[in-house]
Amino acid sequence: VRSMYTYIEQAPTVCRAILDTRDERVGGLVQLFCARPYRRLHIVASGSSYNIAMTMRDFLQAALGIEVTVGWPMSYILYDHLQPGDTFVLCLSQSGKSTNTIAAVEKAVERGNTVAVLTCNANAPIDAAGGNVFEYGSGTDDYYVGKGFPSSCTYLALFGIMAASMRGTLEDETRDALIDALSTEIGGMQDAFEKAQAFCAEHINELVRARRIMTVGIGGGYGLALEGALKLNEMTGIAANAYEMEEFVHGPTYEIRKDHVVMLVDLGGPGHERMMQLSQALHLLTDHVFVIAATEGYDEYSLELGTSSGRNVGSKSDLAAIRAIIPFQTAAEAICSKLDMLSYNLVNFDFEQEMKTKA
C-alpha cells in the first residue's frame, strides 16, 4: 500500500536537485518571462497546483515587483481571460492531464498572451495545448502531491528570485541571501517531518475524532491552509475547510463546537500578532486548537518548526512554506494509518467516472 510518508521523505532530495540545477531547470522559464517587460503575472491552476500558487504568490509579487494574481482554469476560460497584452500567463498542472487547465492554456493562446506551462510531465496531453512547457523536475511518481507540493514551491521561489535578478529588481546580495535561505529551508525538511510525526502521534486521538477541521492562514500561510484542508478532504473524508485569517472571525467561528479542530498556520510576517491573538481566543470555543508555526511564542499545542531563515532578507514573504506543508501531509497520512483505511474514497468512483477531470 502506498504511503504519503514515502514521498515526504523523498521531497528534500528532489527540492535540493531543483536548487542545484536551477540554471538548467528554471532558466528557460526565466528567459521567456524576461524577454518582455511584463507588468502582470496571472497564474492559472486547479487543486493542489492552485494551492501552490497561492502559497508562493506573495513571494513572487514581492520579488518581481509586479502584480501577481491567481485564478482557477474554468473561471479563466469563462470570465477572467480578458488580460492585458503585458500579462504573462502561467498555467500549472502537476499531472499535465487536467482537462480544465489544458482548456485554459488553449484559451490563453487564443487570446494572444504569452503562455507558459509548468508540469511534472512535459509529455502529457497539456503539451499539445500550445503553451511553452517546462518541467518542475519532481518526476511523475507521486502520491497526493507529497513531494510535488514542496518541489513546486521550490521551483516557483527560484523562478521569482532568478527572474527578479535578471529584471534588475533584486540586488545580487539579496538574491544570494534568498538562495541561501531556500537552501536552509530544504535542509530543514527532514527535521520538520520528524517533528510532525511526533506531534501527530501525540494528538492522533483528537485528530481522528474530529467531526470538523478548520484550517486558517494569511499570506502564504493561507495557501498552506488550503492545501491542508484539501489533503484532509481527499485522503480521510473528514469535513475540512480553509479560511483566510481575518475572514475566519467574520462568521465562520460561529460554527465552532467543542469537538471541532482548528489548525492555524503562522509563517511570521505582518499577520503574526493577530494570529497569536486568534489562537488564544479560540480556546474559548474549542480545546482542539493547533498551530503550525515557523515562529515562536505559542503554547504546548503548537508545532514550532523553528524560525525561518528566509525572512527579512529582501522579500516580504517567507520560504518556510516548504517545511510548513509537511505537518498537514503527515496528519492526513497519520489519520489514514490510525483508522486502517485506504486514502482513496471508493464511494466517489462512479462520480469521478461521470465528471471526468483528467485527459
Q: What are these model-derived regions, one by one?
A:
Residues 27, 34-175, 179-181, 218, ...:
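Glycine-rich phosphate-binding loops that contact phosphosugars or nucleotide phosphates
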Residues 304, 311-359:
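Peripheral docking tails and interdomain loops at the edges
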Residues 52, 56, 151-156, 224, ...:
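Catalytic-loop motifs flanking and including active-site residues across diverse enzymes
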Residues 2-39, 132-134, 140-147, 151, ...:
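Active-site phosphate/pyrophosphate-binding segments
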